Amino acid sequence: MRFFALFIYRPVATILIAAAITLCGILGFRLLPVAPLPQVDFPVIMVSASLPGASPETMASSVATPLERSLGRIAGVNEMTSSSSLGSTRIILEFNFDRDINGAARDVQAAINAAQSLLPGGMPSRPTYRKANPSDAPIMILTLTSESWSQGKLYDFASTQLAQTIAQIDGVGDVDVGGSSLPAVRVGLNPQALFNQGVSLDEVREAIDSANVRRPQGAIEDSVHRWQIQTNDELKTAAEYQPLIIHYNNGAAVRLGDVASVTDSVQDVRNAGMTNAKPAILLMIRKLPEANIIQTVDGIRAKLPELRAMIPAAIDLQIAQDRSPTIRASLQEVEETLAISVALVILVVFLFLRSGRATLIPAVAVPVSLIGTFAAMYLCGFSLNNLSLMALTIATGFVVDDAIVVLENIARHLEARMKPLQAALQGTREVGFTVISMSLSLVAVFLPLLLMGGLPGRLLREFAVTLSVAIGISLVVSLTLTPMMCGWMLKSSKPRTQPRKRGVGRLLVALQQGYGTSLKWVLNHTRLVGVVFLGTVALNIWLYIAIPKTFFPEQDTGVLMGGIQADQSISFQAMRGKLQDFMKIIRDDPAVNNVTGFTGGSRVNSGMMFITLKPRGERKETAQQVIDRLRVKLAKEPGAKLFLMAVQDIRVGGRQANASYQYTLLSDSLPALREWEPKIRKALSALPQLADVNSDQQDNGAEMNLIYDRDTMSRLGIDVQAANSLLNNAFGQRQISTIYQPMNQYKVVMEVDPRYSQDISALEKMFVINRDGKAIPLSYFAQWRPANAPLSVNHQGLSAASTIAFNLPTGTSLSQATEAIDRTMTQLGVPSTVRGSFSGTAQVFQQTMNSQLILIVAAIATVYIVLGILYESYVHPLTILSTLPSAGVGALLALELFNAPFSLIALIGIMLLIGIVKKNAIMMVDFALEAQRSGGLTPEQAIFQACLLRFRPIMMTTLAALFGALPLVLSGGDGSELRQPLGITIVGGLVMSQLLTLYTTPVVYLFFDRLRLRFSRKNSKPVVEI
């Protein structure tokens, strides 16, 4: 009583406290960063290593395996995967959430150093690492085009100057430059000219390497001067290499230009990048795992004027893709939804109270509670994101509830002609416990979420804390500011003797009278109501089992990623043509704004595309509808497939897959994996629940197997090392020397001129110089036959792995897809040597599915404990919790009606309903218990009177919560796919709960009261006279 009086009788202090809360909130709002979702990125580090010319199997066994054994010892590694292709190995390390990325990077570097002695000696450089997830979509793509500069020169400028500058911006984790490679001097050998001159490829290589050296020469000095010695020991251009003498034949000099074409070109000619229809260099920028995407993009944009100033006029720099506009638009939509929710809630209060002064009180309490929450969000290190702002939108209906309960009770005393200050004090005292019970039990719902681990727990933590803080501030405001404003602003008035004169009052009275009549009938037919109650419990169970489920709603971010997978024997020239064809088909779609892509590198038969769609206001279709339309057109392209998927704000795992979800096969036996993977992939492709089924196992590439005749080689004076060196020199794009320049280092690359290596007959032109100096054709000691070979070798841990990726057809949920895959694996009878499991997002979905029921039960149990402590009763909490089944039925039926799967967002809605719908029961039970204690009423009379007296605040609070959530259901535009499931769940649950709990709660109250009396009679002992 004294606590409430302290604020009611000191209005200045109370107002200043509320103003302080508001000002802190405004300051926090201005300082809060902006993000699409809470920070949920796993720390990921990518290790790269190269050995030009090495086969995928060689890379896997000699490079990947030693590194994996060393990296696998690092603490906190959640998953380690590797992919080895021609001349390249990439290892992805995904760490636990709590692992610091910088500490992990130090451990990775130490592990690389420890494995260095086990790696092949011919590697051009040590393995390197990057603190970025290669499977993440770039946050920004910049393109460089030029009419006069070559692609190699553009690439050099991009990688040497632009990429280095951008990488220094806060938040940038990796700048991947694609579309070409660094400039190089390429030496294209003529096998016939070499044979005629008797010059071996090794001799050419050694001559070039010896002629281009960079060594210190020292200095000369006397007593006065010092002269540094400088020589022309370096060759920098193709023109300088052409006259190089590599051999003497009968006293005549054989120059490099006599046996080879020497050109200024690039290190790897098998690379191509495009933007729309132009050749381009792409700078694909990815953020650090812990970085904020908006702040990083803003930092890059702020740097762009400086970058453009340093770019020559012949180069055009453009932003091809930027993830931030749709994120900003989505957050703006949420902010507008929040404003609409506040307005609707205040409108509901006004319609019920029919007083401007009375409405002003909750109209002040709501913004104070919501704005004050921003200060706590800032102190907790949160961000303004879709989930935290949705929490505030939903909180609108909650925070007004507390003010309504206090205000409505004070207004009742004022109608009884009590003085305003006395009415404020008395009314607040009467419902203070009720308000505290409602708020604490609502906050208790979110305690299990705070203890939930993994990605779902990290994702939901900001939502739970934000909503809990808003409710906590609302509780303080409703018990301090609200009664103070009531006491000083409202006046005593006569009871409304003729409320029918006003429309809302007339409707409310009619509803109350109708409710009273129907409630009497229900209390006389309690068994029927009991059957209905049990039916809702059973229906809950059936609906939860039957409803389709998914992890997270599919987002329309306005960005698509595409992975091209062509025939495994395709040439680079043909693959470049496929890229151009696919880009033209996509560019012609009316919903597409921009398209960029690249192909080449270590995987000739694959490519990547990034598509930016027009803003939502300029296109009618969703991203998924655009994909469905393009899928039909793209299927007509022979010899290659393009798999499209919408970029999501949540991407789990480090695998670069051509679809959104993955199923990984593991085996310690590579032959068993290669035998069963095609069978499993074929069976999964036939499932109607899956689309775009593809695999990263590519073991049907064309290979030419050379079989050495070792006896013949020994007789001819040739060893295997010389033969292998011949092949590497001829066909491996071998980097044989380094050209040092002030800004970068460039390579001299040697191979047989492409004119002489167009088919297998090129092998017949190869020869080795034996120990006697004679040219021995390769065909003298080797035979060759075509065979199949892997284009890549993949590992997970230290096991051979193959990942089958898939998308979901429109109308199919992730739960339906995973169930279909599990059934198929059982039907196929896959042996125990091959193990299958979901990975990435699908894996997290299964883990979440296993914990959902536990989470819901834990929330109910927590609420029961809190209510039990507050009421000092085992029974009354059960009465209050009896409101939950009807809310669950309403929520699940609403999701079914809107064809929305049960996702993590819908789970949040269920958790919220646990907190919302019990408020009705709390108000009923509190007044019934008080009526029994002080009024001497029977339980039947007490609960009946409580239902009628609390009918108006129950209707007000429920409608306030319902209208607070309604904008989420009706919202469109960017990010609506996240907001709608939450709104649908809450609105459906509230409607059904309101219809049923007004009748089931009094029946359950009476049931437990009779049960209590029965047990008390059984346990009572007769008085024994002594």
Swiss-Prot record:
The chain crosses the membrane at residues 7-29, 336-353, 360-379, 389-411, 431-453, 468-490, 853-875, 895-917, 948-970, 985-1007. One of its GO terms (cellular component) is plasma membrane. Disulfide bonds: none annotated. Keywords: Cell inner membrane, Cell membrane, Membrane, Transmembrane, Transmembrane helix, Transport. Pfam families: ACR_tran. It is a multi-pass membrane protein. This is Multidrug resistance protein MdtC.
